[in-house]
Amino acid sequence: MSEPKPIQDTLDRRHSRESSISSASTTSLVFDRLAEESEKNHDASSRPHPSAARHAYTDDNSDAIKESDINDPETGPFLGASSETTPPRKGVDRKLKKVLLIVGGFFVAAWIVSLVVFLTNKSYKHGSQIDHDPAATNRKSGKRVTLDQVQSGFWRPTSHTFSWIPGPDGEDGLLLEQEARGKHFLVVEDVRSQGSADGEAHPDAAESRTLIKDPWFYWGDQQHSILQTWPSKNQKKVLVATQKQRNWRHSFTALYWVFDVESQSAEPLDPAHPEERVQLATWNAQSDAIVFTRSNNLFLRKLADDKVTPITTDGGPEYFYGIPDWVYEEEVFSGNSATWWSADGKHVAFLRTNETEVPEYPIQYFVSRPSGAEPEVGEENYPEVRQIKYPKVGSPNPVVDLLFYDVEKGDVFTVDIDGDFPEKDKLINFVMWADGNVLVKTTNRVSDVLQVNLIDIVARTGKTVQHVDVAKIDGGWFEISHVMYIPADPKNGRPHDGYVDTVIHNDGDHLAYFTPMDNPKPVYITEGPGWEVDGSASAVDLKNNLVYFRSTKESSIQRHIYSVHLNGTDMKPFTDTTHESYYDVSFSSGAGFGLLSYQGPKVPWQKVVSTPSNPKSYERIIEENKDLTQQAKKHELPVLEYGTIKVDDVELNYVERRPPHFDKNKKYPVLFQQYSGPGSQTVTKKFAVDFQSSDGGRRTTRSPRRATGRPSATSTPTAFAIWGWSYGGFATLKTLETDAGRTFRYGMAVAPVTDWRFYDSIYTERYMRTPDLNRNGYQQTAISNTTALGANERFLVMHGVADDNVHMQNTLTLLDELDLAGVENYDVHVFPDSDHSIYFHNANRIVYDKLSNWLINAFNGEWVKVNDAKPKIES
């Protein structure tokens, strides 16, 4: 926490899309449109009478857009966040907190059996549990939510993101603001400078400091627009990026410059090669050197002169230095960096990735040319093809090892660990400097055995300090967790260095303090049982020996913030636990302040608060979303019901969204939203309206069975439909296949996995092991029973042609199997040049228009006519 965090392209925008949440879903929109059709054929008197009293709207919903990932397919303006993790991850899903085992179609079968029992017993009939009106079973008349509103962001709460930055002398409570309204382009400001709750400026607030005045600079006669910035620790220089070009989800290339704050001028990072694109650049803590990757080789630039020193020379298409390849970027680091400076600036640790044996997969672009290169003469009418090194299950993984560079001696070296995993069976999951040591977490290929290694960088020796067989603990696998270093401070009760990590304890994820560094037996800071820590520690206050974290202590669908002493005593809530709430928090570099984000169930708000670590109390509301509150009062939003359903003796959460004017005496069509992916939790108390997944501790997330959602008040199987995106698309098709039309008649699958042998090795083998070890599991999970799919009324499949994550191969292989079996009860829509998020050329709007219209036609019986087409004979 001693170095400034990189800020995003747009920091602290007042109408940020970064941390936004949807409040309406495809389902409710479809029901509204179905209601419109119904009104044409029914007398107005048959409609339920609106509620007699109007109440201020406070929605109990949990369908949120992922923070910092608005374009993610699982979390667009209609979908719930697929998981709750720190840091964010994706799905086929990349927000990975917890996981469940994919074992055949058994979890789907178990869910369907439970669903049938659930419907038969009519256990869905219960009272409303809506936060803003506990007695309400319907809403008073108002405006209807429209598809255009949701897609335009009409229902998205305004939220702000802070990039906390330590002062040059360790000052706490400083923010890095980029493009803030009415200010210079890049400013360091005390969080208290804008006043407290009474509107008065805080007397202790430090003066603002401008780092960059304008969003552009000149070099020679060329003007360059600044897109991203990274200040040095002493705040005298700023590393800036211009002309960014996206690579994969997190990675990009750009032209990099060193901007001098005093002179407000810039120079190229490599003065001898100003036009060469750089993949990654990182400051040291001394603010006098930058290490960067270019053309997959690592270089060092010391600011004392213009000289650039090559650290590696054999980088290229097969070897990567200091940056991850596709699968490590996507599944391990969730970012574009594999470079780590030591705190004293004397050493650099970096990953070497050898992709020599990794097979390639072609990504085709039929409309655009993402490379920016002009086609060869005569090839103008051919698609651009990009070959991606993509390890599918069972195929060779990239071989990775950790290298070190001694800045003073100029040599590169490795440190061997006795008993380490063989190179082809090793994954490096985490690297952290701890004074003169380096902590490295590695696992075997299938991630069920963990080793924690400790390297003495001066002696150039290392040893294993922990060896954990996760499979023996609960039959699960290793979860990637992020460690916080706790330096020794004998005067403050810490005689040795240590670290805080997330470990499995009392059937859940809990925080443990390991000290000294090589001690395998920790002090458990949190213990449960019945609740767990969400992700890793949020912050550590070294002065007061306090650890802050977010947990499920009040409820698995709530999140509150707590503090606890490093010795595991004096745990206290930081947020108000007397009300159902879902909180997130971002702490300042010294943990003296926090940006507290209330995310539901009422309309979200944000405020800056002092923490128990700060002797001076401070509070300032920065966002109330008053406009959204008024909008909610004027519109008809769904009525929500929360509850649990038992699957294999495990209680799983569900949320049922009822139409605004729900009448228990009527029958309604039902749409199930599936995600169900490993690590997913989408049933929460966040402000939003959509079906969600479940999480009830380690047992439910390690279970091979998963239930998601449940029906509204109906027992008519012909009115059941199901849909999902990515893993949810797989779950949708597997449900249709297993059910064979007995419960569900319609399904919509977007970017689905249809055979896990087509997906990447690191993600899939973590849950299913390799095909050699689990051949039956892979066969059973593949969508292959075309006869069963044909027994459904109709289903829809959509996919992006340039999907680098869930390859188009999944959908095309399924279509071939359907053709061979003569199955025709389906529709297909493909999107040229769209990746997994399906956004290219208006594609995302088309996705949701298609889902909405297709579902309306399904519930109106139109697909019955299509499936049994009759020629129109003229008389």
Curated annotation (Swiss-Prot):
Residues 120-875 are vacuolar. Residues 1-90, 689-715 are annotated as: Disordered. It is found in: Vacuole membrane. Keywords: Aminopeptidase, Glycoprotein, Hydrolase, Membrane, Protease, Serine protease, Signal-anchor, Transmembrane, Transmembrane helix, Vacuole. It holds the Pfam family DPPIV_N. One of its GO terms (cellular component) is plasma membrane. This is Probable dipeptidyl-aminopeptidase B. It comes from Verticillium alfalfae (strain VaMs.102 / ATCC MYA-4576 / FGSC 10136) (Verticillium wilt of alfalfa).
